[in-house]
Swiss-Prot record:
This is D-aminoacyl-tRNA deacylase. GO terms for cellular component: cytoplasm. Homodimer. An aminoacyl-tRNA editing enzyme that deacylates mischarged D-aminoacyl-tRNAs. Also deacylates mischarged glycyl-tRNA(Ala), protecting cells against glycine mischarging by AlaRS. Acts via tRNA-based rather than protein-based catalysis; rejects L-amino acids rather than detecting D-amino acids in the active site. By recycling D-aminoacyl-tRNA to D-amino acids and free tRNA molecules, this enzyme counteracts the toxicity associated with the formation of D-aminoacyl-tRNA entities in vivo and helps enforce protein L-homochirality. The keyword Transferase does not apply. Its EC number is 3.1.1.96.
Length: 148
């Protein structure tokens, strides 16, 4: 699995011009599932993301978690996180998980986040989405299961 995590002041996702997910201060998470990913891997990523101390305290030090700041989550599926650009000029996506499997992992990840975070918004798996955000920092983190 790959996660691109961005600290945001606000973010939203639109499908066909309609806002389907909207958050204030919190995290925008781009979620990608790879061929070898399994549901058993999810708890450690949910725990890591929810506990990461990447929000600033009163001294400007990144010392607070999402829960500490009452932050919100916007989770958007993005298979292109598995783009392989090593050969030629057109990315290959053969390392991305099959749509049915990836969607099941995405939905389970969202459900697990909803157990821990009061406000979790999402895009729609497989849809053409327009994501808007205002980065806070910017502060962006990449988590890759191959490195975890």
């Amino acid at each position: 699995m790959r996660f691109v995590i961005q600290r945001v002041n606000h973010a939203n996702v639109k499908i066909d011009g309609e806002v389907v997910g909207n958050i204030g201060h919190g995290l925008l998470i781009l979620f990608g599932a790879g061929q070898d990913d399994t549901e058993e891997m999810l708890p450690k990523y949910v725990d890591k993301i929810c506990k990461m101390r990447i929000f600033e305290d009163e001294n400007g030090k990144t010392n607070l978690s999402l829960a500490d700041v009452g932050g919100e989550l916007l989770i958007v599926s993005q298979f292109t996180l598995y783009a392989d650009c090593r050969k030629g000029n057109r990315p290959s996506f053969t390392n991305a998980g099959a749509p049915d499997m990836a969607n099941a992992l995405y939905e389970k990840f969202v459900a697990m986040c909803r157990e821990r975070v009061p406000k979790v918004e999402t895009g729609r798996f497989g849809a053409d989405m327009k994501v808007s955000l205002e980065n806070d920092g910017p502060f962006t983190i990449l988590i890759d299961s191959e490195d975890f």
